[in-house]
Design a protein with these regions (language model features):
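Core catalytic alpha/beta fold that binds nucleotide/phospho-ligands
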Residues: 1-126
Length: 126
């Protein structure tokens, strides 16, 4: 059963400017996320960071909490070896999924200076 759906769109040029701020990186991205983003070629960082940021906002929308629901760094977006994105949650974000028996599904895309994320939260075990 679908618990929530969220989507978000980010202009990657805005993210390019934000990536220059270490405080922004720490406030928004978890440790593993930062390591992944900084391992990319500089020209790839804004689109991947934009997609990750959009994924965080899409997750919050799917939860129904809005931007203040959880610390953004609790909602990490990582990549499988295949390149497929997934959520790695900690803190209150992880608690919400566990307490409500939810699985998070995520799709990311970026092109033409835009990054988009789509999230579905599915209740399992019903």
């Amino acid at each position: 059963m679908i618990y929530g759906i969220g989507t978000d769109l980010v202009r990657t040029d805005r993210m390019e400017k934000s990536l220059a701020s270490p405080a922004f990186l720490r406030r928004v991205f978890g440790e593993e996320e930062r390591a992944f983003l900084l391992s990319l070629a500089p020209r790839k960082q804004p689109e991947s960071a934009g997609a990750n940021f959009a994924a965080k906002e899409a997750f919050l929308k799917a939860c129904g909490t809005g931007i203040g629901g959880f610390a953004l760094w609790e909602i990490q977006v990582l990549r499988k070896e295949s390149g497929a994105p997934y959520y790695a949650l900690t803190g209150q974000a992880a608690d919400l999924l566990e307490e409500n028996r939810l699985t998070a599904h995520l799709s990311l895309s970026h092109d033409g200076g835009l990054a988009q994320a789509f999230t579905v939260l599915e209740r399992t075990g019903d």
